[in-house]
Amino acid sequence: MLLAASEGRHWRYEVCEHPDGYLVQMRDLETGDLDEEFSTIFRTMPVAFAYAEMSAAFERYAAAELESVEDDQIEFDLEATERNFIDLSDRLGDSGVNGIAAKAWEQQTAQPIARVLH
């Protein structure tokens, strides 16, 4: 279930429910496709929201830099969202787990352990 979303210039960062907490995933605004390489799972909702906001702010900042747009507000937003994420992450002890690593862990634990007796 989608809980919240934060939009950058080309991507939307969605916070969804996940069995292990809250998943932040990246969706292309033009095509609606998910980027399978970008996903992070957080144990706490506030940190997941802060991460989505920070990711969107960073994308807006990077796009403005590439387009040579001078806008102090974009830089201010990035700094504020980054400070908020770092503060919440530190206070709640939640730095997130890469979604690809979590999938690999789930696949490994789902396989039975082969025991060999000599």
Region locations from a protein language model:
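Short N-terminal "domain-start" leader segments
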Residues: 1-26, 54, 75-117
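Intrinsically disordered, low-complexity segments enriched in small/polar residues
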Residues: 11, 20, 40, 47-49, ...
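Short regulatory "switch" loops immediately downstream of catalytic or recognition motifs
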Residues: 26-28, 59
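A short, exposed loop/beta-hairpin motif centered on an aromatic-Gly-Thr core
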Residues: 29-50
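Alpha-helix boundary/capping motif
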Residues: 45, 71-72, 81
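Short arginine-rich
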Residues: 53-67
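A C-terminal-region feature
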Residues: 62, 69-71, 77-78
